[in-house]
Amino acid sequence: GLFGKILGVGKKVLCGLSGMC
């Protein structure tokens, strides 16, 4: 649902910022 989509985007942002992808 919407919450899952927001969580997914948040994880992508954190992954990109931290460089731990």
UniProtKB/Swiss-Prot annotation:
Organ and tissue specificity: Expressed by the skin glands.
Stretch forming the signal peptide: none
Keyword Secreted belongs to the record: yes
GO biological process, any: cytolysis in another organism
Chief place of localization: secreted
Key word Secreted present: yes
Any single GO CC term annotated in Swiss-Prot or TrEMBL for this entry: extracellular region
One Pfam family matching this protein: Antimicrobial22
Compartments reported by the entry: Secreted
Swiss-Prot/TrEMBL keywords: Antibiotic, Antimicrobial, Cytolysis, Fungicide, Hemolysis, Secreted
Family the UniProt entry places it in: Belongs to the frog skin active peptide (FSAP) family. Brevinin subfamily.
Function per UniProt: Antimicrobial peptide active against the Gram-positive bacterium S.aureus (MIC=12.5 uM) and against the Gram-negative bacteria E.coli (MIC=3 uM). Has antifungal activity against C.albicans (MIC=50 uM). Has some hemolytic activity against human erythrocytes (LC(50)=40 uM).
Protein known as: Nigrocin-2GRb
Organism for this UniProt entry: Odorrana grahami
